[in-house]
């Protein structure tokens, strides 16, 4: 066990985690040169295209150190984006150490800090590394100073490297061996292994990625999952080098995969503990009684409705979501029915990027044609009878008369940016009802701390932040509390009928403006009918905005030559009566663009 090192790489987006991982794998001979592709560990197409890591991946490497010993290094690659912080905490809880990669030309950014604090909370040893030293604008001294000031860890011995050119890679490997502690655990105790990740493979069923903490797991052992109490046979074991390599057993301290013929992913919950079954044939002498401390269940922050564009596709969308959930533990969904859109699902996501990626994966990998409603967050509603309910769908909020107060989720937001952009970012944060808590200067970087309603962030805050700061600002946020607020539900009515999927929740101060803007946008999108269509925005029974789409009409008096006005009147009245009858029975098709229109209403 003294020759095992488990470590992961944490960094902000684009600071070079995945490239560094590639170099480490190459240096340890995990892959031949011809198999080296850029970003070996980012296996999804969408990861390669967007240049981000979504799923944590692992590689088990053999490294011969300068002291002549061969060490087993288990590298766990982590995502850097704030939406996937859950993946990061999972990876870190399986490690004893982490390489904190900081781009020497950019310095410390928001997710560097967030992920680094996660690591320190979990008691992981952090080794700072300065990447991109080959760039002419690299400024290592400034980066070191920022690491010390912002994060508060000693960076005097930070290792300079360049993952692109391969400089400093050996020093990093030596530092991993020297500075990161060997795994603690008892090889002779009962087996306890933690599930770091699980995914679904069409051929073998569920594959579990586990970190063995105590004991050993051998091929053919009868295993039990502690949370679900389900029992299985460990059919195949192995490690990733990034290729799969079969093993007869996994020892304490190792990270590897287990295939046990599990059919549904719900059984192999991430964070669960695997142990052996006591007694019986193939049973162990003793079984673990205490589960490992797992990580907290993730709470979705952003909700949206996903509906199939054809009602007949509902089943296939459900299958697609089930399969996707196999691979993405943080996706939540439940069936819901909308009058406007038929049957679909209410899905919960960690954030907007997560939502986009889920949508894109459903469309790409499962060929789904989707209609998505505007994202919303969870509100706490205190009803007049004193009970509290949580509502994640705006159309489900009870009428104003039956509600005492609505509480919206408030988050603490940390914003980092160069000092030139402070003014613009503060203006933006104030527009979004932010309350400034703190402002700190670190060299040329400024860190602003705000309290903000999550509902204001989910629509377009991130995009706007990037545009006002020319891409330099970065952010991360964490949930703080539910707080009573003057928010109202705005319903959109077409010819007096509520369209439930178009309801939005906004602050009362913005309600009239948002109502008008949505109604105007809807007017452009809905095509003209044979009868007048009234589009209204309402709070309760109070109409706050209205637009009318005029009917298409035939020129009925074209055939009259001169003559009596009453003849023309008669024809016009007849047409009017027909239109009126039509309006009573006619229904209006709401196109997909209408649901997206709500998202694009500028503040």
From Swiss-Prot:
**Where is each tr-type G domain found?**
2-184
Q: What class of enzyme is it?
A: hydrolase
SUPFAM superfamilies for the chain: EF-G C-terminal domain-like, P-loop containing nucleoside triphosphate hydrolases, Translation proteins
Sequence positions that bind GTP: 14-19, 131-134
PROSITE patterns membership: G_TR_1, G_TR_2
List localization entries.
Answer: Cell inner membrane
Identify the EC number(s). Answer: 3.6.5.n1
**Membrane topology per the record?**
Peripheral membrane protein
* One annotated GO molecular function: guanosine tetraphosphate binding
- Gene Ontology annotations of biological process type: positive regulation of translation
- What is the official name of this protein in its record? Elongation factor 4
Query: What are the leading ranks of the lineage?
Result: Bacteria, Pseudomonadati, Pseudomonadota, Betaproteobacteria, Burkholderiales
